[in-house]
Amino acid sequence: MTNTNTGAEKVRWDLGLMYSGLDDPQIDADVAALVEMVKKFKTSHKGKLSTTLGKAISGYSEIEMLEGKVKVYLYLLQSINVAEPAVKTKIADVDKTLCREFGENLPFFRIELVALDDATLAKLYADPIVAKHRPWIEHARFFKPHFLAEPVESALTKRAPFGAISWGDFFDELEADLEIEFRGDKKTLTEVLYMLTKSKDADERAELSRVIARGLKGPFSKYAAQTLYMVVGDNSVENRERTFKHPMEPRNKSNRIQDEVVDALHNVVRDMGGPLMRRFYRLKAAHLGLKKLKWSDRNAPMPFADTTVVPFEKAMTTVLEAYESFSPTLAGLIRKSIEEKRIDAPAEKGRRAGAYNYSIVLPGNIPASFTFLNY
């Protein structure tokens, strides 16, 4: 994406562990298999969890692993080219099929799981499979007050591809396609933001801030506002229907943390963040020789900042040495990830912004981990 070669251009992942390509017929075969699996799951276990919970958990795990294989593969593929029409079409087709069939056949499972009485569940824990999944079961039962009727849960799952998730994907595509013109060259948002944080020229930073502001105005800002409205609105309505007391409650419960702990963190950040920020910017202005920072100076590099371009291979060596110093096991996992080509590193136009690691368990209980970067 930038003109600086770092060696990251050659670091691309190999997704052959899952499929050979977007046209691999095994993708459709796996989707068809999932459809049959969820239908059989409902027939075998609906209304029978008091006697079949162990087998149900095993079957549900198989469904989740195969679903993960399909969906994670497509997500990884889309990350390197967000607007690729063929990938978008495939994702849409898969989502519509799976959400329809999952919505029709799976909602009963969690609803009936949380409805099991304590005495019945205590007996079921004699099954090694059920006992192994006890933390997962208890966590699911923690949400018992918030489940809706089965027909409602079914409808929500079926319409999921056409709601907030779709708007989020739409925004990612808009952001990846956004072009900002700077001194005659068209650049991506990620590139100009990077330049803004690295430029030591105050006039250049001011110019970059202006072109970024212009680029974010107009149609992009309207679509961004509409996306936020749809996502927040969808979440707000569902939270009320599920009787959550406030927007953070579902996340806090999912993280198994009390509201009071999160509130304490928020309060400390609110009370101390402002003064610390002002202190930091006063110190930064002094280092830059300025009485007052302009908006475009907020992320300016310090005069003593090292602007050396670090080749990807050297950066990876540093990471490995750091992990090796406290956990040879973790260092070994990273080294294995490099050897098996599980990293996609270059910063290029059209890629998803940011970085992430996606770890999953594939069918056959095969662990896999993929790392996405914009180096």
Model-derived features: positions:
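A well-structured
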Residues: 1-322
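Active-site-adjacent "gating/activation" loops or surface patches in catalytic cores
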Residues: 184-201, 238, 308-375
